[in-house]
UniProtKB/Swiss-Prot annotation:
Its EC number is 3.4.11.18. Substrate binds at residues 198, 309. The keyword Hydrolase applies. This is Methionine aminopeptidase 2-1. It comes from Emericella nidulans (strain FGSC A4 / ATCC 38163 / CBS 112.46 / NRRL 194 / M139) (Aspergillus nidulans). Binds 2 divalent metal cations per subunit. Has a high-affinity and a low affinity metal-binding site. The true nature of the physiological cofactor is under debate. The enzyme is active with cobalt, zinc, manganese or divalent iron ions. Most likely, methionine aminopeptidases function as mononuclear Fe(2+)-metalloproteases under physiological conditions, and the catalytically relevant metal-binding site has been assigned to the histidine-containing high-affinity site. Residues 1-90 are annotated as: Disordered. One of its GO terms (biological process) is proteolysis. Belongs to the peptidase M24A family. Methionine aminopeptidase eukaryotic type 2 subfamily.
Length: 448
């Protein structure tokens, strides 16, 4: 989820499953296929029948029964669409590591230092929660990348991703407090073309994904407030490939900057490296060549527990910020590229909101605002949410109360952020954990 570099946002301290299907045996529909049927009776001829016609008749062998053996079920696999909780797929509670990168230069001692290794072991629960969320993100986005097609509505796409995240985390978010334990870290953003961030459809939205669209897919999964924030861009026309490649390369450059310095790296150094990479690309559209520009007022950010924007920003252009990254911090390294001006403004209908952490006590006169604030506190806490989430909880006629909460400074609204119309924007993002001994790109996958 993007952090906007503006005075308004810098002061923020944000913190239905359809058709459940279980993973079955390797060969579905062959129940008891491994059972061994009883052997048929073996009749033996009466050995003395022809010789003496003995009264005892034929001697028969007794039946031999073999015990029934049932075929063991195969290992559980993810369903399609994803509905099997990852906790069922990793029953031992140990989830895959992200990309592990050793510290270099003045921090290289951390990899083997006994004190740092001890601190790393003490962080196991913290890391397993992050890795579980990252595995949820990987499995959901793998399905999304294969199945999102032009002609689908944005509502259909967003709800499909969100339902999958809830299923895989094991938190449907319909009971009070459940979404705070796990589930969506923030609403699924589906920002199209010149819109760079913070767009998700509200109820009744009929927008359809088109063949020529460039769509940013930005969503978060969390376990116990450990938010994994990762994003990618989809297009269906190879003409946009240079734009996507530029932004992906810029994001990886930002991550490499961490690999070289990591702990104690200055934010300004990361921004300069990202800008240099991004601006080395260009794209030709309809016979015109456009330089690819970093969107200078969008940033990466650090992540705290239940807080998506923790207070530190990671710029994507050169600047003078001397703030350093510190041991134990978690960062979302994200970059945005544009064929337009490289600057975004608030535009279009707002869908994203979040409770302002440590907001001052303000008397609310509207009963609808008081009631809505109670719902927000019990269901989302400081996690971001959107109007569709209120609809899902059965809330209605809440807009007046919601606007009152925004005007009172209790809730922050996040309007979509857009470059000039006619331009195209792209985004790639990963979550990084600065462990005492190594850096871990927690959300890294085979896709990006």
């Amino acid at each position: 989820m993007a952090a906007q570099a503006s005075e308004k946002l810098e002061k923020l301290d944000l913190n239905g499953q359809n058709g459940e299907s279980a993973a079955g045996p390797a060969k579905a529909g062959q129940a008891d296929a491994g059972e061994v049927e009883d052997e048929s009776d073996d009749d033996a001829d009466d050995a003395g029948a022809a010789a003496d016609g003995a009264a005892n008749g034929a001697a028969k062998k007794k039946k031999k029964r073999k015990s029934k053996k049932k075929k063991k079920g195969g290992a559980k696999v993810q369903s399609s669409p994803p509905r099997v909780p990852v906790s069922s797929l990793f029953a031992n509670g140990q989830y895959p590591e992200g990309e592990i990168v050793e510290y270099k230069n003045e921090n290289s001692y951390r990899t083997t230092n006994e004190e740092k290794r001890y601190l790393d072991r003490m962080n196991n629960d913290f890391l397993q929660e992050y890795r579980q969320g990252a595995e949820v993100h990987r499995q959901v986005r793998q399905y999304a990348q294969k199945n999102i097609k032009p002609g689908q509505t944005l509502t259909e796409i967003a709800e499909g991703i969100e339902d999958s995240v809830r299923a895989l985390t094991g938190h449907q978010g319909l009971e009070e407090g459940d979404n705070i334990k796990g589930g969506m870290g923030f609403p699924c953003g589906l920002s199209i073309n010149h819109c760079a961030a913070h767009y998700t459809p509200n109820a009744g939205n009929k927008m359809v994904l088109q063949q020529g669209d460039v769509m940013k897919v930005d969503f978060g999964a969390h376990i116990n407030g450990r938010i994994v924030d990762s994003a990618f861009t989809m297009s269906f026309d190879p003409v946009y490939d240079p734009l996507l490649e530029a932004v992906k390369d810029a994001t990886n450059t930002g991550i490499r900057s961490l690999q070289e310095a990591g702990i104690d790296v200055r934010m300004s150094d990361i921004g300069a490296a990202i800008q240099e990479t991004m601006e080395s690309y260009e794209i030709e559209l309809n016979g015109t060549t456009y330089p690819i520009k970093p969107i200078r007022n969008l940033n990466g950010h650090n992540i705290d527990q239940h807080v998506i924007h923790g207070g530190k920003s990671v710029p994507i252009v050169k600047g003078s910020d001397q703030t350093k990254m510190e041991e134990g911090e978690v960062f979302a390294i994200e970059t945005f590229g544009s064929t337009g001006k490289g600057y975004v403004r608030e535009d279009m209908e707002t869908s994203h909101y979040a409770l302002v952490a440590n907001a001052p006590q303000v008397p609310l006169r509207l009963s609808s605002a008081k009631s809505l604030l109670n719902v927000i506190n019990k269901n989302f806490g400081t996690l971001p949410w959107c109007r569709r989430y209120l609809d899902r909880l059965g809330q209605d006629k809440y807009l007046l109360g919601l606007n009152n909460l925004v005007q009172s400074g209790i809730v922050q609204d996040y309007p979509p952020l857009c470059d000039i119309k006619g331009s195209y924007t792209a985004q790639f993002e990963h979550t990084i954990v600065l462990r005492p001994t190594v850096k871990e790109v927690i959300s890294r996958g085979d896709d990006y």
